[in-house]
Swiss-Prot record:
Its main location: cytoplasm. It is found in: Cytoplasm. One of its GO terms (molecular function) is methionine adenosyltransferase activity. This is S-adenosylmethionine synthase. It comes from Wigglesworthia glossinidia brevipalpis. Coiled coil: none annotated. ATP binds at residues 15, 164-166, 230-231, 239, 245-246, 262, 266. GO terms for cellular component: cytoplasm.
Length: 385
């Protein structure tokens, strides 16, 4: 018997780093709404009473950055200085400049399919058949707990909840299959008046119990709810926030490797983002086809060069055909050039604000979550599954 524990964490939409991600992607969406060919790299820094946005943009779009930022913060729920941050009164500093002409020349080509990558980099994609969404269970349920935290807060079911929160969940695996949940952790910001006992009871009854499958819960499952006690000071007052600091929460919860590039605030010419979406699409279709139970793909690019430099695949011994044949199928069925990624997944639409919370993967309405190539891959493999 090979038993082990695996843990993933998530954070709420009101976590400072996630506020920053949402602001960056809100600005990106506003620009893409007016100018689909825009080049955008928008970073956000947030701290008590202040938001600073910076980066590089090449676009003719005219947007009201201050209004976008204030509305985003209001949507998240920071509307009162008692929460440590107020959308209506925070200072906003804008230091966005033009993109370098040298980079622009390297990307823009007469034939868009010859468009080079916006930077060098390594990118990973992953899928597993351990859940219906082809995502690892630990990050899936860590995200679900945070989605539920937001829901009960905004519906006033637990009126003392505040926007900042974190979750962490540890699964028990036996022979690579889930057999239970070992530990659940939730820390949630709250108002002054709630006592710790009522807080823990409310979070258990309204957030944890409705989300976690009973088949994985036992009398040995451990729960830590606000384990340090009071959590009144949170959000940007408790910690500064920065775009791109939650890359493991954004992806696979540590179950797969990560190339290091973040997503939010970047237009799809940046392969850090577009190739990560594409490789999720490729890996998910391989697993959905039955050609592997788990699939991790690495790709690399050079700045200004259209074709990928390398492709590597790892199937953890679960493949039904050789990894070499799988790579051939990838080349035959997916265009992984930067412009090819954009066309394949229709990435010029203003869809990115929603990706900035609760993970970029598993939301089935996004194009990189389609499994429309699964049957093609299975038929092309030459084997019956």
């Amino acid at each position: 018997m090979n038993q082990y524990l695996f843990t993933s964490e998530s954070v709420s939409e009101g976590h400072p780093d996630k506020i920053a991600d949402q602001i960056s992607d809100t600005i990106l969406d506003a620009i893409l709404t007016q100018d689909k060919k825009a080049r955008v790299a928008c970073e956000t820094y947030i701290k008590t009473g202040m938001v600073l946005v910076g980066g590089e943009v090449n676009s003719y779009a005219k947007i009201d950055i201050e209004e976008l930022i204030r509305n985003t913060i209001k949507d998240i729920g920071y509307i009162n200085s008692n929460m440590g941050f107020d959308a209506n009164s925070c200072a906003i500093l804008n230091n966005i400049s033009k993109q370098s002409k040298d980079i622009e020349k390297g990307l823009n080509q007469l034939d868009p399919y010859m468009q080079g990558a916006g930077d060098q980099g390594i990118i990973f994609g992953y899928a597993t058949n351990e859940t219906e969404t082809f995502m690892p269970a630990p990050i899936t349920y860590a995200n679900k707990l945070m989605i539920r935290q937001s829901e009960v807060r905004k519906k006033n079911i637990l009126p003392w909840l505040r926007p900042d929160a974190k979750s962490q969940i540890t699964f028990i695996y036996e022979n690579k299959k889930i057999v239970g949940i070992d530990t659940v952790i939730i820390s949630s910001q709250h108002s002054e008046e709630i006592n710790l006992s009522d807080l823990r009871e409310g979070i258990m009854e309204e957030i944890i119990q409705p989300i976690l499958p009973k088949k994985w819960i036992s009398n040995k499952t451990k729960y830590f709810i606000n384990p340090t006690g009071r959590f009144v000071i949170g959000g940007p007052m408790g910690d500064c926030g920065l775009t791109g600091r939650k890359i493991i929460v954004d992806t696979y919860g540590g179950m797969a490797r990560h190339g290091g590039g973040s997503f939010s605030g970047k237009d799809p010419s940046k392969v850090d983002r577009s190739a990560a979406y594409a490789l999720r699409y490729v890996a998910k279709n391989i697993v959905a086809s039955g050609l592997a139970d788990r699939c991790e793909i690495q790709i690399s690019y050079a700045i200004g060069v259209s074709n990928p430099i390398s492709i590597f695949i790892e199937t953890f011994g679960t493949q039904k055909i050789s990894n070499k044949k799988l790579i051939n199928l990838i080349h035959e069925n997916f265009d992984l050039r930067p412009h090819g990624l954009i066309v394949m997944l229709d990435l010029l639409k203003p869809i990115y604000r929603e990706t900035a919370v609760y993970g970029h993967f598993s939301k089935i309405h996004f194009p990189w979550e389609k499994i429309d190539k699964a049957n093609i891959l299975r038929d092309s493999s030459g084997i019956k599954i």
